[in-house]
Amino acid sequence: MTAKVGINGFGRIGRIVFRNSFSHENTEVVMVNDPFIEVQYAAYMLKYDSTHGNFEYDVHIDGDSIVVNGKKVKFYAEKDPAKIPWKDAGAEYIIESTGVFTTVEKASAHLQGGAKKVIISAPSADAPMYVMGVNEKTYAGADVVSNASCTTNCLAPLTKVLHERFGVVEGLMTAVHAYTATQKLVDAPSKKDWRGGRAAAQNLIPSSTGAAKAVGKVIPELQGKVTGMSIRVPTSNVSVVDLTCRLEKGASYEEIITAIKEAAQGELKGILDYTEDDVVSSDMKGNPHSSIVDIKAGISLNPNFLKIVSWYDNEWGYSRRVLDLTAYIASVGK
């Protein structure tokens, strides 16, 4: 079954989801809505990307549609989500990627336009949260769901393996995260987060994140046992999680890596991966996995206390999971 997808919000994630959909056999984007840009500009931003390069397919416009590789995708510019005519374009599964409509109440407005389900491409305060490979099988038919954050998608599969094999007593995470659109190019006012107002390309910026705590939402046994913070760094893409944790069942670093390899080649194939190469962040650009464990970067102090390092392309890999979750929900048919 191919899920007919609509995208609301054609920013970083919206466009990367769109690009990903052309190599995702179970999803098809049939409509895009963004009230802040015209169709000509949408096509331009889709075609050219400073981080991921030029789109491999031909892109042009035909009236109010974007045409990619001969395929027409309707483009609308409606501000009110309740008035977006998803049904007219056959869009049933809506990826809400504006960053604005992140609660069940706000995102549910899409249902009025004919949507069947809404997948929020961000954490949500009240929508059920799912991470592929971790808890998607608990999906029970909710009309609005969250795909969590890119960092939670990196951390949760890794933590799942550690917890199921060795038992995670507690953990602290630091996400070394590429800068994003919410940050400032030069020092500028940022009333709620003073540090966040400093120039993104000139500073290492400590920041709060709910990504680690969110692991407790997708792995309930770890509620209150994992937390963390982030440091925004002057790179445009690719981030890395540094997880330090205490294990209930002692194991050598080699035994832990063996468990990770088994999971990456087994039940978490396509989601969790690993590398034994001397990689740096740019080597991970375009990697479709949620979490790529850097075997050489991890260390163990003793059998019960260790640090695991795992990379993720916070744009490309995350967008892939958004489509995977969308396809899964469509296949379940609840």
Curated annotation (Swiss-Prot):
One of its GO terms (molecular function) is NADP binding. GO terms for cellular component: cytosol. D-glyceraldehyde 3-phosphate binds at residues 149-151, 180, 209-210, 232. The record marks 177 as: Activates thiol group during catalysis. Pathway: Carbohydrate degradation; glycolysis; pyruvate from D-glyceraldehyde 3-phosphate: step 1/5. InterPro entries: GlycerAld/Erythrose_P_DH, GlycerAld_3-P_DH_AS, GlycerAld_3-P_DH_cat, GlycerAld_3-P_DH_NAD(P)-bd, Glyceraldehyde-3-P_DH_1, NAD(P)-bd_dom_sf. It catalyses: D-glyceraldehyde 3-phosphate + phosphate + NAD(+) = (2R)-3-phospho-glyceroyl phosphate + NADH + H(+). NAD(+) binds at residues 12-13, 34, 121, 314. Disruption phenotype: Does not affect the biosynthesis of heptelidic acid. Its EC number is 1.2.1.12. The active site is at 150 (nucleophile). Pfam families: Gp_dh_C (PF02800), Gp_dh_N (PF00044). It is an enzyme of class 1 (oxidoreductase). The keyword Iron-sulfur does not apply. GO terms for biological process: glucose metabolic process; glycolytic process. Keywords: Glycolysis, NAD, Nucleotide-binding, Oxidoreductase. Homotetramer. Glyceraldehyde-3-phosphate dehydrogenase; part of the gene cluster that mediates the biosynthesis of heptelidic acid (HA), a sesquiterpene lactone that acts as an inhibitor of glyceraldehyde-3-phosphatedehydrogenase (GAPDH) and a growth inhibitor of the salt-tolerant lactic acid bacteria in soy sauce brewing. The GAPDPH hepG/gdpB shows much higher resistance to HA than the GAPDH gpdA located outside of the cluster, but it does not seem to act in self-resistance. PANTHER family: GLYCERALDEHYDE 3-PHOSPHATE DEHYDROGENASE (PTHR10836), GLYCERALDEHYDE-3-PHOSPHATE DEHYDROGENASE-RELATED (PTHR10836:SF76). Belongs to the glyceraldehyde-3-phosphate dehydrogenase family. This is Glyceraldehyde-3-phosphate dehydrogenase B. It comes from Aspergillus oryzae (strain ATCC 42149 / RIB 40) (Yellow koji mold).
